[in-house]
Regions:
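Hydrophobic alpha-helical transmembrane segments
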Residues: 113-122, 143-196, 372-377, 390-418
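Interfacial segments at transmembrane-helix termini and the short loops linking adjacent helices
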Residues: 40, 104-116, 316-348
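Helix-loop junctions and terminal segments of transmembrane helices
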Residues: 27, 58-77, 263, 267-291, ...
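Transmembrane helix-bundle signature of multi-pass secondary active exporters and lipid flippases
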Residues: 50-58, 260-280, 310, 340-347
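Interfacial transmembrane-helix starts/ends
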Residues: 76-92, 224, 290-306
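Signature of the first transmembrane helix
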Residues: 8-62, 228-255, 265, 401-405
Length: 419
């Protein structure tokens, strides 16, 4: 790898990291806005609707954004267009699954189905747009596609809350705000439908540094998994992420769900930042695994630093509750701070190594390991439903977070050993 290419990867990673951190700050502001201006029940219902939409979108994508980054032999714009068509068709086929999830959550089918559909398709476009800009976008485009959607959503939620208090309007402010934000993000996918005669300057700069024989000797990271395995991996991840919200709604009610999801929304963004600013950039730039001890240590330091940030955020939330800066109705968040910090901190360590399987041709093993972990997590999550006397929400989350953390740490150790 040439000096120029190293510098370019570093700059791209820095841009994505900074923009992701800015988006993270906006997400925190959005979460604080929900804590101050909305009730736990409103936050809980919004979390259920948005999570079902996320579940639908994730299944429809079937890890297509990751494949779009890993398989660089396909032109970026053509690949994005094909990915959208295939994902949209899968989304339509999964409509009954989304309806089943809504029914299980015990929310009214209408207009919940409409909101879920709109959220799913707009978020699907935004996810593909992020991968597209990583491969074929400028630095400012890579930053804007990450920052503008959450900024739009937070601004809309604030305006909607103020308008609602002034006009006594009780409409779905949070859902509308999220929908507008996702729509702004999906708009960045429009360039995929524009024919481009000339090569993209970003991709051209990389090709200048690559000798003709390098494509044979050093193939870029790829995704060799079958479509069935990718779908199974996606299904396991999406089902678990949605089941957490839906099971909490069913067993413990909207208020308890609001306490859990509000904190999870803040802490859960850090693993996403690590994945976007580190793993995805490494895949998008065709970066190969380095064998030096220093290179191997970098993901550990990155993951540990992110873990420390999760701890700081958890402590900040505890201080806010202790100092009574939040409404007394949010006192129930106390029980979720420690387990969620442990769970999401472990997720940061795992995310720091998530590019390694694709660089070492171990993607199949990675998918099977993630599926196995998801099954173990599901057993812990659904166990109280079959008990004659359900356990308390605090005990349930403690058991689930412990199992998840141990599994994620084991996964991180395995990925760190890949060569």
């Amino acid at each position: 790898m040439s000096w120029f290419k190293r510098i370019r990867v570093s700059n791209t990673s820095r841009v994505v990291a900074l923009s992701s951190m800015l988006a993270f700050g906006i997400q925190i502001a959005f979460a604080l806005l929900m804590l101050r201006l909305f009730t736990p029940q409103q936050v809980g219902e919004f979390s259920v609707i948005s999570q079902i939409g996320f579940f639908w979108m994730t299944l429809a994508l079937a890890q297509t954004p990751l494949s779009l980054l890993a398989n660089q032999h396909i032109p970026a714009h053509s690949a994005a267009k094909q990915a959208w068509h295939a994902s949209a068709m899968r989304a339509l086929g999964l409509l009954p699954v989304a309806a089943l999830a809504i029914g299980f959550s015990q929310l009214s089918m209408w207009p919940t189905m409409l909101w879920v559909l709109l959220l799913a398709f707009c978020q699907m476009g935004w996810m593909l747009a992020q991968s597209l800009t990583l491969r074929a976008g400028s630095s400012w485009q890579q930053a804007a596609v990450r920052v503008l959607p959450p900024l739009t959503a937070a601004s809309t939620a604030l305006i909607g809350a103020l308008f609602g208090s002034w006009m006594a309007w009780t409409g779905p402010t949070l859902v509308l705000s999220a929908l507008i934000g996702y729509a702004v993000g999906a708009a960045w996918l429009i360039p995929a439908w524009r024919e481009r005669k000339e090569p993209n300057p970003n991709e051209q700069a990389l090709s200048v540094e690559r000798p003709a024989q390098e494509s044979v000797k050093h193939a870029p990271p790829s995704d060799p998994r079958s479509a069935t395995l990718r779908m199974a991996h996606t299904l396991a991840d999406a089902l678990l992420a949605t089941a957490i919200i839906v099971v909490w709604q069913r067993l413990y009610g909207a208020e308890e769900t609001g306490w859990m999801t509000a904190l999870l929304r803040v802490l859960g963004f850090l693993p996403a930042v690590v994945h976007m600013a580190w793993a995805q950039v490494a895949l998008a730039q065709g970066r190969h695994t380095q064998t030096s001890q220093t290179a191997l240590a970098n993901p550990w330091w990155l993951g540990l630093a992110a873990f420390a940030c999760v701890i700081v955020l958890g402590l900040s939330c505890a201080v806010a509750l202790y100092q009574k800066w939040l409404d007394p109705r949010w006192h129930g968040v106390w029980a979720y701070i420690a387990p969620l910090v442990l769970w999401q901190g472990s997720a940061c360590l795992s995310a720091a190594f998530s590019h390694r399987p694709f660089q070492t041709k171990s993607a199949r093993g990675y998918s099977w390991a993630c599926i196995a972990l998801g099954l173990l997590q599901a057993l812990v999550l659904f166990a109280p439903i079959g008990l004659a006397q359900p356990i308390e929400a605090e005990q349930h989350m403690a058991a689930f977070a412990l199992m998840s953390s141990l599994g994620l740490l084991a996964l991180a150790v395995w990925m760190a050993r890949l060569r």
